[in-house]
């Protein structure tokens, strides 16, 4: 499978929007616009890497907006113009060398997974692909408040982002076209002789440029929602040690759980359940065991990340349910603390967090005390 990276362009000042706060940090559904945009790509199962390109003065704003989205690459600073910023972003990816790169406006927070799918799919056959909408309105060219000409709209398209490219091709094109001030990245590849395909765009994938655009996005964002159910399952074997960590609670035990992180099986199962609600892959995609950053890591990082993806998409966690399978240790004395800890991480009421336990009647690996297993179910709601 091709390695896909996403560059989120958020280095502009948004002069047409007005105000002191750049538009990408204005709030939509109580969260910064840019956070929603980042989360859409971080949650996509085929996007392996996400990096923002930001203004040098926006480090603190970006840090607050991206807080809790643990899998993002470090942001890079942009240049004087959008084209400069994108080139710098592309250069920053040379060490990871993706096959494809998606370049997206930070102020398009309502991009959906199906549109991203279409762009990625087109790159198998074309060096570039962009989402676009056929022009439906009659077009007029005029000056001084008067119509000078009616323009034939046949074959005209409104370009959107994410604009997708084979990485080597768009990097070479940006290097060759530096300083030419082209209006989008497709134009950069075109100028270098590359072919760019069109795929279906989406009306809701509009760029927020004015306050009226933000009001429209807010109406779409807060529309009637849908419910999603996800499930997760995890197992960790028991080895040397004198405690186990279950749902964030350290419990004395004759053995310890073995794993790359803290081996918190029920919290891992719950993380997978939440990611499943979003069709966002599994915990191993977001936090691969090959990455030493997560060696011995507190699993609350993983769970908080999954919850942040849901919140950034305008969703709410309605309830979660976890069952721990083990003979020992006894879970009952720790159940209330487990529920409270999970509720704290997920920022929901403990009444929405069910923690249960069962034995397997001394059958199987859990019955023999070789490991601990857990299964989890989550119910969330997302706006349409």
UniProtKB/Swiss-Prot annotation:
Required co-factors: a divalent metal cation
UniProt-recorded Gene Ontology molecular function terms: 2-C-methyl-D-erythritol 2,4-cyclodiphosphate synthase activity; 2-C-methyl-D-erythritol 4-phosphate cytidylyltransferase activity; metal ion binding
Organism: Rhodospirillum rubrum (strain ATCC 11170 / ATH 1.1.1 / DSM 467 / LMG 4362 / NCIMB 8255 / S1)
The protein's Enzyme Commission number: 2.7.7.60, 4.6.1.12
Protein name: Bifunctional enzyme IspD/IspF
Highest taxon of the lineage: Bacteria
Pfam family of the protein (one): IspD
Top-level taxonomy: Bacteria, Pseudomonadati, Pseudomonadota, Alphaproteobacteria, Rhodospirillales
Region 2-C-methyl-D-erythritol 2,4-cyclodiphosphate synthase: start-end pairs: 228-384
InterPro entries, A to Z: IspD, IspD/F, IspD/TarI, ISPD_synthase_CS, MECDP_synthase, MECDP_synthase_sf, Nucleotide-diphossugar_trans
Residues binding 4-CDP-2-C-methyl-D-erythritol 2-phosphate, per UniProt: 234-236, 260-261, 282-284, 358-361, 365, 368
Region of interest (2-C-methyl-D-erythritol 4-phosphate cytidylyltransferase), ranges: 1-227, 1-228
Catalytic activity field: 2-C-methyl-D-erythritol 4-phosphate + CTP + H(+) = 4-CDP-2-C-methyl-D-erythritol + diphosphate; 4-CDP-2-C-methyl-D-erythritol 2-phosphate = 2-C-methyl-D-erythritol 2,4-cyclic diphosphate + CMP
UniProt record similarity statement: In the N-terminal section; belongs to the IspD/TarI cytidylyltransferase family. IspD subfamily. In the C-terminal section; belongs to the IspF family.
Record keywords: Isoprene biosynthesis, Lyase, Metal-binding, Multifunctional enzyme, Nucleotidyltransferase, Transferase
Biological process, per Gene Ontology: isopentenyl diphosphate biosynthetic process, methylerythritol 4-phosphate pathway; terpenoid biosynthetic process
Residues binding a divalent metal cation: 234, 236, 268
Annotated metabolic or biological route of this protein: Isoprenoid biosynthesis; isopentenyl diphosphate biosynthesis via DXP pathway; isopentenyl diphosphate from 1-deoxy-D-xylulose 5-phosphate: step 2/6; Isoprenoid biosynthesis; isopentenyl diphosphate biosynthesis via DXP pathway; isopentenyl diphosphate from 1-deoxy-D-xylulose 5-phosphate: step 4/6
Site location (Transition state stabilizer): 16, 23, 260, 359
Site annotation Positions MEP for the nucleophilic attack: residues: 153, 207
Function per UniProt: Bifunctional enzyme that catalyzes the formation of 4-diphosphocytidyl-2-C-methyl-D-erythritol from CTP and 2-C-methyl-D-erythritol 4-phosphate (MEP) (IspD), and catalyzes the conversion of 4-diphosphocytidyl-2-C-methyl-D-erythritol 2-phosphate (CDP-ME2P) to 2-C-methyl-D-erythritol 2,4-cyclodiphosphate (ME-CPP) with a corresponding release of cytidine 5-monophosphate (CMP) (IspF).
Nucleotidyltransferase keyword on record: yes
């Amino acid at each position: 499978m091709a390695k896909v990276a996403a560059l989120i362009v958020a280095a502009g000042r948004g002069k047409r929007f007005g105000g002191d706060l750049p538009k990408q940090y204005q709030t939509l559904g109580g969260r910064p616009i840019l956070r929603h945009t980042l989360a859409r790509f971080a949650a996509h199962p085929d996007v392996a890497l996400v990096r923002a390109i930001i203004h040098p003065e926006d480090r603190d704003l970006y840090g607050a907006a991206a807080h809790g989205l643990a899998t993002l690459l470090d942001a890079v600073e942009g240049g004087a113009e959008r084209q400069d910023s994108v080139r710098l972003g592309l250069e920053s990816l040379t060490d990871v060398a993706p096959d494809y790169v998606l370049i997206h406006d930070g102020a398009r927070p309502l991009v959906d997974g199906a549109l991203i799918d279409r762009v990625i799919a087109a790159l198998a056959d074309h060096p570039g692909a962009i989402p676009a909408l056929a022009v439906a309105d009659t077009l007029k060219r005029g000056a001084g408040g008067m119509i000078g000409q009616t323009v034939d709209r046949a074959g005209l398209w409104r370009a959107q982002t994410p604009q997708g490219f084979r990485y080597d091709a768009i990097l070479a094109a940006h290097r060759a076209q530096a300083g030419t001030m082209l209006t989008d990245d497709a134009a950069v590849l075109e100028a270098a002789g590359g072919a760019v395909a069109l795929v279906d765009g989406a009306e809701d994938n509009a760029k927020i440029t004015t306050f009226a655009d933000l009001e429209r996005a807010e109406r779409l964002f807060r529309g009637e929602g849908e419910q999603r159910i996800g499930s997760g399952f995890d197992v960790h074997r028991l080895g040397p040690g004198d405690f186990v960590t279950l749902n964030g609670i350290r419990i004395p035990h004759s053995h310890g759980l073995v794993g790359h992180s803290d081996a918190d099986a029920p919290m891992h199962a719950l993380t997978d359940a939440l990611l499943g609600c979003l069709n966002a892959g599994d915990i191993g995609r977001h936090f691969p065991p090959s990455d030493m950053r997560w060696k011995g890591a507190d699993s609350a990082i993983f769970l908080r990340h999954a919850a942040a993806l849901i919140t950034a998409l305008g969703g709410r966690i309605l309830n979660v349910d976890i069952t721990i399978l083990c003979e020992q240790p006894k879970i009952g004395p720790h159940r209330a603390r487990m529920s409270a800890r999970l509720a704290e991480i997920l920022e929901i009421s403990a009444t929405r967090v069910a923690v249960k336990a069962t034995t397997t009647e001394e059958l199987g690996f859990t019955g023999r005390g070789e490991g601990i297993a857990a299964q989890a179910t989550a119910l969330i709601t997302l706006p349409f």
